[in-house]
Amino acid sequence: MDLDSSMVPENDQDPIATSENQSPMEEKEEASEQQTGSESESASLTPSLPPPSQQQQQQQQQPQVTAVVGPRCAPTYSVVNAIIEKKEDGPGPRCGHTLTAVPAVGEEGTSSYIGPRLILFGGATALEGNSGGTGTPTSAGSAGIRLAGATADVHCYDVLSNKWSRLTPYGEPPSPRAAHVATAVGTMVVIQGGIGPAGLSAEDLHVLDLTQQRPRWHRVVVQGPGPGPRYGHVMALVGQRYLMAIGGNDGKRPLADVWALDTAAKPYEWRKLEPEGEGPPPCMYATASARSDGLLLLCGGRDANSVPLASAYGLAKHRDGRWEWAIAPGVSPSARYQHAAVFVNARLHVSGGALGGGRMVEDSSSVAVLDTAAGVWCDTKSVVTSPRTGRYSADAAGGDASVELTRRCRHAAAAVGDLIFIYGGLRGGVLLDDLLVAEDLAAAETTSAASHAAAAAAATNTPPGRSPGRYGFSDERTGELPESAPDAVVLGSPVAPPVNGDMYTDISTENAMVPGIRRTSKGVEYLVEASAAEAEAISATLAAAKARQVNGEVELPDRDRGAEATPSGKPSLSLIKPDSAVPNSVIPAGVRLHHRAVVVAAETGGALGGMVRQLSIDQFENEGRRVSYGTPESATAARKLLDRQMSINSVPKKVVAHLLKPRGWKPPVRRQFFLDCNEIADLCDSAERIFSSEPTVLQLKAPIKIFGDLHGQFGDLMRLFDEYGSPSTAGDISYIDYLFLGDYVDRGQHSLETITLLLALKVEYQHNVHLIRGNHEAADINALFGFRIECIERMGERDGIWVWHRINRLFNWLPLAALIEKKIICMHGGIGRSINHVEQIENIQRPITMEAGSIVLMDLLWSDPTENDSVEGLRPNARGPGLVTFGPDRVMEFCNNNDLQLIVRAHECVMDGFERFAQGHLITLFSATNYCGTANNAGAILVLGRDLVVVPKLIHPLPPAITSPETSPERHIEDTWMQELNVNRPPTPTRGRPQNPNDRGSLAWI
């Protein structure tokens, strides 16, 4: 059975451009060392100039403006001489296979470390009309693949060692097939569809799990109807969540349907989408690649009339759930199908392809790049302004050697960092077995300069309806916020992830691009009940603080009453200092939020990698009653256990040595905590001496990393240390400080690990590691939400209760805020109704308990911003009676009063790990992922450089391990008590899910 028409045979010799058995990574490192000024990043990323004619045109139009550089041309490819120790280790000649990049596993430098890999699956190893894979067909008109030669083999190319090997996974493999699809979900490869010796393959999803030392095949159970058997279709993981399957051929005709599987919703189910907008026609042999921000780009293909297509289409999901197609801007250099395409940051690299009738894409058009930041196509020569009319005859061999290398079809491509790999394919009736590589140095150049330089070339050649900038194809925000306004807070064009997990990305296509606007969700009528949880525990304390204020026990001058000083509920304008007032629309010179955020792709451990357990919002319930937290007698008896002495300095070192393992830490098999109460007492004594000597408001310097709520999710803390540097002499503690914004305990399963490690780091690096207090650093709160239970469960009732009391006494000494460079203030909650000046916080005397605190302390630890920038003044807080939310006007007033430019606070779970408010003058930060196993949120930190540019860095939630499903005994033993706690006392809902609009006029519950 033939899948396509023939390819006219040619006798080509592929040049060998790389040195023998040297990995592309090693070549890249050597090339970097040979460059002059290799230490300068900008030197290696300088893009090429536009063509001379374009330069002259730009100079004529703008004679007074220096010409800007444009997008780089497509890179050239060379052959990789990979190591193949045994014949079966090499994939050999084949076509119709898939090549998928998989990130590294394990800790680098250890025996268990496995570097980035390319996984090759399936494909055809023979052609119709000949028995060998590399021979000439018996007929020039019949060179279709021989389905009897389709395989289910798995081969692995280790990028670092430059070595091929054949894998023999456990489990039942998929049937032999070609023209199938595959995509990576973390360290897993999902395979679907295709055609083999028995005909069309079933629509089942097969997963190759590479998280373990030996890979394993799994079959994913999917309910309901799905795409059905098909081949020549496309599939990609969009937005780290949706598996999208599009088009192909069902054995009768080409298709144009779109199917989505939400990996965050169980049971798994395919859903047929009906996207709006102008989409691609029914076609097969196209390519689909997902950009990191959730934009899917479908390129090329062959329609029902066997005509090759040139257009590219973007598919994006709106915040309201709608999907929409849009035609990508720019002019493609050539139509094509059976090509390969892969994103490297914001640049889509397209290679090879067929034109039908035995012809292939040749000349400079055989390699092309769609620069989605600039909105233009480039080939190996220049920006493309019209379709190329080069030679496309099948007998035109010779010419540029690099072009000859990529003149092929039915091959496969994958990217590792800024390296693009191509394997195999078909050329002139000959199956290929070569591995090619190219390096895209322009991958990081997603700049407004590139957009401006390309605009002149693209403006007059953009067909009607192809609007650059739709769905972020180009950086349309450049026109709104030019580079001449350096202090504007901008979210820049997204850049796709390299395989090591790091990526630069626009902050999620599902999020509002306008600061202060949040997503909504169904079931919001349940949020009022859920959000009353923690406030119920603190309501008595808040009432006592108000009573003391009324009775004069706590003196608050008029200026300290904030919004309460005016009948309208808004702050008095007289409170704003005339000499410090700044425009509300632009942050003053100095502090800026970087236009990109660094994201770590979700690691995997389940059947579909990025799948995260998710509970419906209607499962949130009100908090239950308190539990007892022991008696003074039990605490006194426990204290008598301290009958031995230990060196003060030995305990912190023991803790750091035992716990600071960013890549190697695993939850202990035994829940018994590794420290006894004597050691914890020594650790607390050492840390308390340091905290007592520090001011209530810390004075810190940049550079510094800022962490939000951790809530006992120690694994997330280790992942953040692993991805973005750890506080050790082997890490980055010598040149950057660490600041933690509170809520170290409760909710998570490893509060003891979290707080003891942070205290040990404070003792070891007291001038570099800084901790301030959160609302859960209080006995009344952490008695209810997990910390006390964990202490008892892991240390025994007597020791556990004593340790819980001792750590809470230490919490009373924690500083309450931090000023960075006197321009940024960091706190846990917010400014509430009462805080107008930093001096109010500085005047709070420590140690202090919640019961003894004032309204200022309550606001500092408990208040939140309002729903969005349009809600000003003060509003009741959904957390519970007596608590408030504050609007953007309060933020601006506070910044003006104190000559500040930014407030960084934690306290609320936000979907992307960080969220802007008050036109970027306030950032909410949350570092724990998938809060309480229900929120499915990312975790983030902020990195403030010496230039006061704030860079968000994110990690995604980890999915449940496939080897330990939710119903397994291991998982049941591990977290039964914590699951019960979260069911009985659900967390405060994720920020951005507002109250039901029908209930907004009814706030009597406050």
UniProtKB/Swiss-Prot annotation:
Region annotation (Disordered) ranges: 1-67, 454-494, 552-579, 982-1006
Phosphoserine modification, residue list: S616, S964
EC annotation from Swiss-Prot or TrEMBL: 3.1.3.16
Chain segments annotated as transmembrane: none
UniProt-listed Gene3D superfamilies: 3.60.21.10, Kelch-type beta propeller
Kelch repeat copies, ranges: 138-184, 242-290, 295-345, 351-398, 419-465
Tissue specificity remark: Expressed throughout the plant, with a higher level in younger parts.
Catalytic activity of the protein: O-phospho-L-seryl-[protein] + H2O = L-seryl-[protein] + phosphate; O-phospho-L-threonyl-[protein] + H2O = L-threonyl-[protein] + phosphate
Family annotation (SMART domains): PP2Ac
GO cellular component terms, semicolon-separated: nucleus; peroxisome
GO terms classed as biological process: brassinosteroid mediated signaling pathway
Residue positions binding Mn(2+) 2: D743, N775, H828, H907
Enzyme class: hydrolase
A GO MF term: metal ion binding
Functional summary from the UniProt entry: Phosphatase involved in elongation process, probably by acting as a regulator of brassinolide signaling.
Protein name (database record): Serine/threonine-protein phosphatase BSL3
